[in-house]
Amino acid sequence: MQPLTKDAGMSLSSVTLASALQVRGEALSEEEIWSLLFLAAEQLLEDLRNDSSDYVVCPWSALLSAAGSLSFQGRVSHIEAAPFKAPELLQGQSEDEQPDASQMHVYSLGMTLYWSAGFHVPPHQPLQLCEPLHSILLTMCEDQPHRRCTLQSVLEACRVHEKEVSVYPAPAGLHIRRLVGLVLGTISEVEKRVVEESSSVQQNRSYLLRKRLRGTSSESPAAQAPECLHPCRVSERSTETQSSPEPHWSTLTHSHCSLLVNRALPGADPQDQQAGRRLSSGSVHSAADSSWPTTPSQRGFLQRRSKFSRPEFILLAGEAPMTLHLPGSVVTKKGKSYLALRDLCVVLLNGQHLEVKCDVESTVGAVFNAVTSFANLEELTYFGLAYMKSKEFFFLDSETRLCKIAPEGWREQPQKTSMNTFTLFLRIKFFVSHYGLLQHSLTRHQFYLQLRKDILEERLYCNEEILLQLGVLALQAEFGNYPKEQVESKPYFHVEDYIPASLIERMTALRVQVEVSEMHRLSSALWGEDAELKFLRVTQQLPEYGVLVHQVFSEKRRPEEEMALGICAKGVIVYEVKNNSRIAMLRFQWRETGKISTYQKKFTITSSVTGKKHTFVTDSAKTSKYLLDLCSAQHGFNAQMGSGQPSHVLFDHDKFVQMANLSPAHQARSKPLIWIQRLSCSENELFVSRLQGAAGGLLSTSMDNFNVDGSKEAGAEGIGRSPCTGREQLKSACVIQKPMTWDSLSGPPVQSMHAGSKNNRRKSFIAEPGREIVRVTLKRDPHRGFGFVINEGEYSGQADPGIFISSIIPGGPAEKAKTIKPGGQILALNHISLEGFTFNMAVRMIQNSPDNIELIISQSKGVGGNNPDEEKNSTANSGVSSTDILSFGYQGSLLSHTQDQDRNTEELDMAGVQSLVPRLRHQLSFLPLKGAGSSCPPSPPEISAGEIYFVELVKEDGTLGFSVTGGINTSVPYGGIYVKSIVPGGPAAKEGQILQGDRLLQVDGVILCGLTHKQAVQCLTGPGQVARLVLERRVPRSTQQCPSANDSMGDERTAVSLVTALPGRPSSCVSVTDGPKFEVKLKKNANGLGFSFVQMEKESCSHLKSDLVRIKRLFPGQPAEENGAIAAGDIILAVNGRSTEGLIFQEVLHLLRGAPQEVTLLLCRPPPGALPELEQEWQTPELSADKEFTRATCTDSCTSPILDQEDSWRDSASPDAGEGLGLRPESSQKAIREAQWGQNRERPWASSLTHSPESHPHLCKLHQERDESTLATSLEKDVRQNCYSVCDIMRLGRYSFSSPLTRLSTDIF
């Protein structure tokens, strides 16, 4: 759109109103507003007569000329103009109800001048406007067009004011010339000092104006570019759209009129924006939010706009490209003329196109610096420039010259005649494991934009339900909450902007529109950044999150075989492509990768576990080398994140290129830190709350030199706060790195918790701001125990919810100590950190502790003791009060009983939190007190198969009293370490909990996963006298024995086969098959078979002996529905003759996806009432931990993955009524897992599984977000399939075997 007035074009003698305000740094005076009002009204009337008023009046379209005139330009960003558009234009009108252009301009002009009058005015301070001017502006900004004053009446009011001011009033043009002179004079001075070699005065002025505008806005760090970046120049036509002032709305006084502030206005808070707000006389409204940046960038305006129906990246993609010039020192110092420059198109993540003027010899790094400076990005580590080839993105090195990768003809031909378009894309190259690691909201927004587009373009796999949920979250982020005035069945958004085309084709656009609208209506209120953060939380759980996929071929080049390599920060994934779906076949983590090499077109990965070489063929040697460099860069990024360096520090990729196949001893000598990390299986994961501030890093706290008094200083001086994201603050926590001793010859690190003096074995913790760390010693009371009640954190589904003190028992030891307060988190007990401990593990640890315990607690600052208000708040947050607990009879004296007692306590609803948490029953096991005079040790708790338990053994004669077998160098399944035998009368036999066949998971904090047999033995025979073991029960205990020194339990008990000790599939499958059995033949179409299925767990119905696979939904117009014989709820007994009996979820999924075109299903229709009805509504996934990249370790050269899935993911429940995306309440719980079958780009999660998910139920759940409406549903299971492996089971010291359902477990000591 061209400027529509004769002075509209941006020239050397014209500036925008926004530029003048930014340079000036303060609001317009009253006389200046009168002058602008007069000149603008005249110009608008003239443009309306000439039918040339096709523009929106706003601070960026109002051009002030040096001659003292005012005009308007039409070349303004839609995002910037939107807040000043009249409401009737935003709402849309029918063809026969065209709005009055004059009235729309009146509204926009009034909003623009009111915006200028409130520029940089504090929220609490009223505007200094006289009554006549204030009344005119308020009348111009009326919501209803018929209530606004006309342009003629505005002119008349200006003439009346001119007569009343003075005998000799200053001309209106004089105020305009002063504003223009302020800007142009400033530019001239800076121009002379900074830029001397540029041949274009216009381009210098554009660049310096933009730099000045951005530099003067200091209220928002994100609005300023890093000083180290090279400057760039923007053409005059695009300068003022980048950075502009934003006023604070303040008091409107002395007026009988009212002003409707649209939610599109900058500075308004979300609640008031949504409903609209009337600012009337005598009322004070502080609509400005200090969290919003002063400079309203496109990002800021997008968050505060109203009734937008299109996403940001679609709106900006349709606009004309903005011209960006590289700095003069780059393109002109060699004497290059302007015409010798070439046009390079750079597409930003928000869809905006930049036309970069550059030299043919310019480097990618120079373009990257200019583009990121233009986009105001600060955390540059994660971004890169890439070009597209065959629908794949290839990132460029910063030193690469553009002429080396430009298309043919781009270098030779001048820009005016060149028909070859050279396009680069600014994209995210390195993905963080959690958005909390991103320090700036603008960076998080860029992640949101890329993931949003990748899902829409089907580059990132999602199943159907998650696609719909993400569509709703994107709608909330970009549109807002469901409009109250919305008429049912009337569309208010474009379906294709939020849902991928394949799903629309499968479900029909009308049905998608209805379902998304209904989910939007019922979803909890979210707005702006909060919705974006929730969007990121869900996408970061997807198995393909952060994976850069490139097509490769097998070494034998079979035409029917399609393969792809996925490279991410954790390693390399090998995919097999079938039916447009990617199936993960192999996974190589960096620690399992011995060598990556290339030779011509061949790309080879050598496994350090099996020694096998896996060779793939690329389309060219250049691609092969690129994949090697990409692996090196991703490995380096992962090492940088794991080392605790600040994420904004750029790292040198060359430091991580060396990936030779060294021996373990050599690797240990050369890189001890990496070797320790590899052995500990930590995979360099960072917990989100372990960030420091801007100079942050990993808060590494050891058990050394714990000093309570010094913790306050450390907390005040050395700790930065975790980033706040929206209304949700990520609470910081201490990272407990347990002391490790390392020997390059012996191999694995051995924990030395007991080596050295007692002081050296203590941990130091650093208090968060507003909190303190206390150390207290308690003595057990025979009646009240230790006198406090503990519970798991409010959000127990996350990776480390923590152990908290919910209340203090009156008269107990804790109350007498006068230092413990409810709500405090127990960090350590008897010098053992509780980080990563589950509730049950903490219960056993406290119950088995001696009569004197030492606690390290982090609690809020204040007077010690029990504050009734604090206790009330604490118990309200946890949902369990001490009174409630005592009413159940759970007092400390119960622990003196000599027999095991199992009690079922019904979970209480969380007080004060509207959350879709289904009721469930949780079993607590209590351990008796140790009896000194008992000849028989206390009977241990009943531990079910698959449960993890904690044992502390004191060595006798240097032994623990049991032998082990297994290791990755043995034939034991999955390379685990198992208890082979129990020595009669030894420490293990006396303790009584350990059984033959149990799997040993951890010894003194050292994870045994991935270790050889010798290394595991070395861990067990470490120097410490007390060994703290974490084990997994493999077989149920048949009888409890009271062993003594004379018992021959080990001899009498037959050896347990390690194979049979592993939980296997049921020997038989007794399905509900009383109904008729029938066979159906289906033929796949482009969308698959056209149905989704769920796996119903046997725990959901008492009469089931095995899992059932049931059809959940039939998609309209697809083969399953067209067949007519299949109905929702039918049981799938077999697929192509292979029975589903005993198969786990992933195997059924792969069985259906890998089937040929014609599929034969053996179905059974259960009798009515035999099984619960399937819920067809949508459910909300648990917004939980970031998935880990994993692959199973094989001892042979297996070609299919061995993947583990956490046992707890098999538990699912339908939500109760409340907030979230669940639509209607359900009283019954269902244990189901669902997979949508029929999406043309849907990727199954694994090709085959060789063992059941019960094998490793202790998988770690990292970075679990604290969310008030977290649920575990079938969606979560879909998200988490194929995300775990034996070698990546858990992070150091973290375990989670509880149900992912949010629960509150309490006990008293």
Curated annotation (Swiss-Prot):
UniProt keyword list: Cell junction, Cell membrane, Cytoplasm, Membrane, Repeat, Synapse, Tight junction
Subcellular location: Cytoplasm; Basolateral cell membrane; Cell junction, Tight junction; Postsynaptic density
GO cellular component: apical part of cell; basolateral plasma membrane; bicellular tight junction; cytoplasm; cytoskeleton; plasma membrane; postsynaptic density
Reported impact of residue 955 to E: Abolishes the basolateral membrane localization
CDD domains from the UniProt entry: FERM_B-lobe, FERM_C_PTPH13, FERM_F1_FRMPD2, PDZ2-PTPN13_FRMPD2-like, PDZ3_PTPN13_FRMPD2-like
SMART domains membership: B41 (SM00295), FERM_C (SM01196), KIND (SM00750), PDZ (SM00228)
Protein's name according to its UniProt entry: FERM and PDZ domain-containing protein 2
